[in-house]
């Protein structure tokens, strides 16, 4: 299933920040959002993922087809790496936990509690959830935060495999994942006109990636 976004408008803090956004993302393709901080990259990603309503426009893909990864890893601290992935696999109704451990190079950490992982290891575990979901569209908001160069390269390989298997990826990232096939969408032309005195309120997502 392709993702088609048509005349989408998104709001942050009750104020529209993007409008008339339209694009199509096909199976096997990746699209990287670009724009200055505060333009609304995170807001757009959250809207496509179904985490907040659109102000206007249409999104063709239902939230049930989307796997979303942002800054919070969503780990259960007292569960081991393997138990966290088994928990997510049960939620999503898949049997992909073992594959996720292998693909994200977590085998040596499988029996370690999440609370005892380094920041980079926690990030790899959080991203491993994408593999567990079995969902075709990955929506990624700065997915490489806390990852070292080797882990960035590893995750780039994981994304390429996802695309080769017919998945798609929509992301905001300042790090090169080595996705030569990825297209770029500059959000500057879609910035909404903001009346004086109605600037969007600060939110926990805007400071780093929006």
From Swiss-Prot:
Q: Which family does it belong to?
A: Belongs to the ABC transporter superfamily. CcmA exporter (TC 3.A.1.107) family.
Name the gene behind this protein: ccmA
Supply the source organism for this entry: Cereibacter sphaeroides (strain ATCC 17023 / DSM 158 / JCM 6121 / CCUG 31486 / LMG 2827 / NBRC 12203 / NCIMB 8253 / ATH 2.4.1.) (Rhodobacter sphaeroides)
E.C. numbers: 7.6.2.5
Domain ABC transporter: from-to ranges: 3-209
Q: Can you quote a single GO CC term?
A: plasma membrane
Protein name, please?
A: Cytochrome c biogenesis ATP-binding export protein CcmA
Query: Known NCBIfam families for this protein?
Result: ccmA
Binding of ATP: at which residues? 35-42
Question: Which reaction equation describes what this protein catalyses?
Answer: heme b(in) + ATP + H2O = heme b(out) + ADP + phosphate + H(+)
